[in-house]
Amino acid sequence: MTVETQPAAPAKTDGGPDASNPASAAQRERQAWMSILAKAESKDLADRIGRLQNLPAYSVIRPAECGSVMVRGRAGGMGAAFNLGEMSVTRCVIQLTGTAEAAVIGHAYVAGRDKQHAESAALMDALLQTEQWHAAVKEMVITPLANVAADARRERSGKVAATKVNFFTMVRGEN
C-alpha cells in the first residue's frame, strides 16, 4: 500500500513549467528543503537553528495551529484511491521583518502537533528565500538535516535487507 501523491505534470511545450524552466527548478528546490524541514526531528532542527547568528526579526502571520488532513492510499500503488485515515498536522506562516527583503513569507506544515517545529520550519523557509541567508541556512541547517535523514534511510534499508527471504521453486523430475 502506498500513499497517493499528485502525478508529475508532463513537460509543456507552450512555455509552461518543465525541467528547463528556472522557476520550476526553484520550485523543486523549495519543495526539497520544505520536505527536509518537515521531516526533521524538532530537536535536531532547533539545534541547527541555534548555530545561526543574528537571525532577523519576523512576525507571525498565522500562528502555529494543529489540525488534521485525510491521507489517501492506493492498494499496490495502482488501485482505486481510498481514504486511509486522518493524520495530525501543524501549520504556521511567518513574515520576515528584519531584512531588506521584508515581504518574504515562510510556510510550514509538519506531521504531528509540535507548534515550535512548525514555526522553526516556517522561519527557515523564509530565510532560504532570501539571498542574504540562503547559503548559510542551506549549509548549516538543510545539508546536515538531509545527511541525518539519508543515514537513517541507509540504516533502515540495511535492517530490512538483513531480513529478506529469497523464495524459489524446485522442479521435480516428474512429467
Outline where the language-model segments fall.
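Charge-rich, low-complexity N-terminal segments
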Residues: M1-P56
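Residues that cap or initiate secondary-structure elements
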Residues: A100, D114, G173-N175
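Generic structural signal of hydrophobic/aromatic residues within well-ordered alpha-helices
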Residues: W33-I36, L45-I49, L123, V137-V141, ...
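Short capping/connector residues at structural and topological boundaries
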Residues: C92, K115, M170-R172
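Cysteine/selenocysteine-centered motifs that mediate thiol-based redox chemistry or coordinate metal-sulfur cofactors
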Residues: Q129-N175
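A short, structural micro-pattern
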Residues: E86-S88, A121, K159-A161
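A hydrophobic, small-residue-rich beta->alpha segment in the mid-to-C-terminal subdomain
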Residues: A102-T143
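Structured beta-strand/loop patches that form or line metal/cofactor-binding pockets in enzymes
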Residues: G50-A102, A108-V110
